[in-house]
Structures are given as structure tokens and as C-alpha cells.
Amino acid sequence: MPLPPIEDERLSPELERSQTVFRGAIWNVKRETFRYNGDLLTRDFVSHSGAAAVLAINDREEVLLIKQYRHAIRSRNWEIPAGLLDIPGEKPRDCAARELLEEADLQAKVLDPLVTLHTSPGGSDEVVYIFLATELSAGNAKFIRSAEEADIEALFFPMKRVVKAVVEGRIRNQILVSAVLAAHALRIGSQIEHQ
């Protein structure tokens, strides 16, 4: 018997009730009651605008990482440039380009989709669109960073060193982990195909 396609399946269960039970500065919490497999279920989840992120790789196959404070985990975290889809009508690709410029003062001639992910599907509807940026150059504008972005460090690291840090558990930001492993897998696959 052949295996089914490996693909997430969208469903639209019968929704009995949906209400916003908390309004926050950045996201809200919704409570929804719905029917699934004959049962009436109630679930709370973070209602999120979504985000875009960018894995920037320079001509030396080095990956751009930024270090930024994240209060929820009380840590300065290595990440890739990312930001909320909070500008009405802004496309994920445009958001990724904006974040690369705002957080790292860089622009990319090539910005291709890399991977799309749900960050925590058991408790949030957030979707993150991750792009692969190449052919990098200095941006035309310098941004004044404030709050947690005020002391961002932006450095390029060899891809192999970043992959090693991921598998050793030294960096844990899931957007960075997903992006770097996807890019690494694509590069390995490309090398195998060309042998």
C-alpha cells in the first residue's frame, strides 16, 4: 500500500463560538469552541499576525546571526532577522527584506522562499515565512534601533559552525534552527545531485 503524501491537511471544523479573551500589546488570546470527531471542544490559543524572517548567506557561505534580548526566556538569543507582519497589506517577502535592512543594515539582490512554519500549532496560529537571502550588500539607510533592538549584535558565522551549534543545543531559537537546517539540507542535497 503506498504511503500518503506528506502534507499538512487544512480542516474547517464547525465553529460554535469564537471570542477574544485577552488583548495584548502585540498579540491576543482567543477562545474557540468547535466540533471535532463528534466532540464539543474548547481551546485557547494565541492569535498572531504572523511573521517573516530571513536567513542571509554571504559569498563565503557564512550565515548572518543577530543576538537580541528576549525577555520571556531572560536571554540574549542568537536569531536571524525577523519581524511581525503588522503593516497592513505588506507581503511576507517585503517584511523579510525590511527586517534585514532594519536589523542588519543589509539588502539582498536575491530573496527566495526557504521554509514556512507554524511556531507552536498546539497553542498559536502564528505562521512564519522564512526567506533565503543571497547576493548581499550594504543597505541604503541606517536605522536607529531602540528597546530590545538597541544592542543587537550582527555577525556572520560559517554555516557548518552554526549547524554544529544547533545540533549541540547551544542555540535554540526555532526560527533560526529551522532555517539553518533547511538551508543546510538544500546545500547537501545540491552537492549530492552534482556528484
Give the ranges of each region predicted by the language model.
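Unchanged
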Residues: 41, 50-53, 84-174, 194
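Extreme N-terminal tail/first-helix region
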Residues: 1-23
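Generic C-terminal helix-cap and adjacent flexible tail
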Residues: 185-195
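Structured adenosyl-cofactor binding patch, chiefly the S-adenosyl-L-methionine
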Residues: 177-186
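Short beta-strand micro-motifs in enzyme catalytic cores
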Residues: 28-32, 76, 127-129, 153
